[in-house]
Amino acid sequence: MARPKNVKHIFVTGGVISSLGKGILSASLGLLLKSRGLRVAIQKYDPYINVDPGTMSPYQHGEVYVTDDGAETDLDLGHYERFLDEPTSQACNLTMGRVYKSVIDKERRGEYLGGTVQVVPHVIDEIKEKMGDLAKNGSIDVLITEIGGTIGDIESLPFLEAMRQLKLELGEHNLLNIHLTFVPYIKAASELKTKPTQHSVKMLLETGIQPDILVCRSEKPLSREIKNKVGHFCNVHDLDVIGLNDCDTIYEVPLMLLKEQLDLRVMKKLGLKKFREPNLEYWKNFCEKVKHPKDGEITIGICGKYTEYPDAYKSIIESFIHAGASNDVRVLVKMLRAEDAEDPKFDISSAFKGISGLLVAPGFGDRGIEGKVRFVQYARENNIPFFGICLGMQCATIEFARNICDLPDANSTEFNKRTRFPVIDLMEHQKKVKEKGGTMRLGSYPCILKEGSKAHELYGKFLINERHRHRYEFNNQFRKLFEEKGMIFSGTSPNGDLVEIVELKNHRWFVAVQFHPELKSRVQKVHPLFDGFVHAAKEFAQGKRQLSLEVEMPRLSSTEMENAG
């Protein structure tokens, strides 16, 4: 198998427990290497048998991250893009399901010449072939591959075997393994315990892989003594034991790893020389704004269907961090369960207590829809900054149709196929689609903005490109009526057929979009819609505080005023 020359491979694995942050580690290392002038790409390998996460429940998988080319991928790709400010693609996320599907398709076409198809060599060879796809055009120096799951999981074994074989083929100076483990702190003993890390490395060794570098997550910093102990029992040099203790924000991780010299250890082992010193001043400034905002805090409510699991809204939450830093405030998120508002006895005004803005989040299905519509109505009627995304835009138009356009049972045909007023309907090209996976309107599409609109003011240009993931769209039969009643269709597809952005006149800030702007917000490039929304919420909060102060300030009598003078 021909492989591109001079491309260095870094594989990131995890042990002891899940959710240690392999994605953040991979993205942080990528940022450090990029800051030294290296061309870096990152990919994620997931061991589940699904072809992609597009049909998986948000409760199990979290957010589905959509790339420009329309791939439905793991949320870790969002971290890669936000940290490196580089687009990802379908090639950056491989699942075991895609591997097996490809192997079976080849068998059906007779490409194995009648042989018995087995995990070794056929599945392993398929994985190794995919491992080099991103490096084939010679446009990168380093390829970082994050392997999902935890060492010891049976599902990950084919990926690990492929990595083992690849290291033999490429040589130890062209491939290294970084193993992320957990060093728990036992409060009763006031000690950090290394035994779980030792056992995790032992399990990795059973697959034939000796880790080159250990990154140890812990509640408290690792002492030199602890690092020496880990290195001694795990057959790793103590300089290759990297401490990564808990921090206030994930955006501090690159700075912590820089201090621990992870990038230097990686470059030395891979024979990478003569690269510039990293300049992360902008990153340090961003972290300072996140940790110590000049103008305090504001609270924004996220009304959604999956509020018990914040990872379902990962990119939205991260976008609020970016926009908060841009506006010198810390954005606190209050999760608002849409289903709660479907109860007529629910006091919606109490839910808005302390909230300076409302975002109605994406989702699918009719559960909680009437609650979302009710939240939209309250924000519109009380002039509270409002931002709707995807389903949030659809709920905004349903609410407007019912309460402003006098279409009492207006709805989406997704929720009520017999509604008299289908203001949201299935897109024409979707009506013959039967399969669920990978069949929505996915990926980046152009949008034309209306001159003088809020959207045009925020973007500062007429043509934008945004990422989509939907089947339903605004029904143009109702466009004229909506415009007459005060709704502005400020963004459409280039041919004008598809509504992408709606706004309201005479409202402090009311913008709803069919696309997913949260997927394109970056540390250095906060998304203009989130930036504008947080700015409006900040002004709203400051206005409420000023009003509160005026109400609380005692009124002086004329005599008292004269005496004061």
From Swiss-Prot:
Binding positions for CTP? 18, 153-155, 193-198, 229
Pathway as given in its UniProt record: Pyrimidine metabolism; CTP biosynthesis via de novo pathway; CTP from UDP: step 2/2
Activity regulation as described = Allosterically activated by GTP, when glutamine is the substrate; GTP has no effect on the reaction when ammonia is the substrate. The allosteric effector GTP functions by stabilizing the protein conformation that binds the tetrahedral intermediate(s) formed during glutamine hydrolysis. Inhibited by the product CTP, via allosteric rather than competitive inhibition.
**UniProt binding sites for L-glutamine:** 59, 363, 391-394, 414, 471
Q: What class of enzyme is it?
A: ligase
Q: Which reaction does it catalyse?
A: UTP + L-glutamine + ATP + H2O = CTP + L-glutamate + ADP + phosphate + 2 H(+); L-glutamine + H2O = L-glutamate + NH4(+); UTP + NH4(+) + ATP = CTP + ADP + phosphate + 2 H(+)
Q: Which superkingdom?
A: Bacteria
- Per UniProt, UTP binds at 18, 193-198, 229
Q: What does the sequence similarity comment in the record state about its family?
A: Belongs to the CTP synthase family.
Per the entry, what this protein does is:
Catalyzes the ATP-dependent amination of UTP to CTP with either L-glutamine or ammonia as the source of nitrogen. Regulates intracellular CTP levels through interactions with the four ribonucleotide triphosphates.
The extra comment attached to this record reads: CTPSs have evolved a hybrid strategy for distinguishing between UTP and CTP. The overlapping regions of the product feedback inhibitory and substrate sites recognize a common feature in both compounds, the triphosphate moiety. To differentiate isosteric substrate and product pyrimidine rings, an additional pocket far from the expected kinase/ligase catalytic site, specifically recognizes the cytosine and ribose portions of the product inhibitor.
Q: Any idea what this protein is called? A: CTP synthase
Per the UniProt record, the source organism is Chlorobaculum tepidum (strain ATCC 49652 / DSM 12025 / NBRC 103806 / TLS) (Chlorobium tepidum)
**Gene symbol of the encoding locus:** pyrG
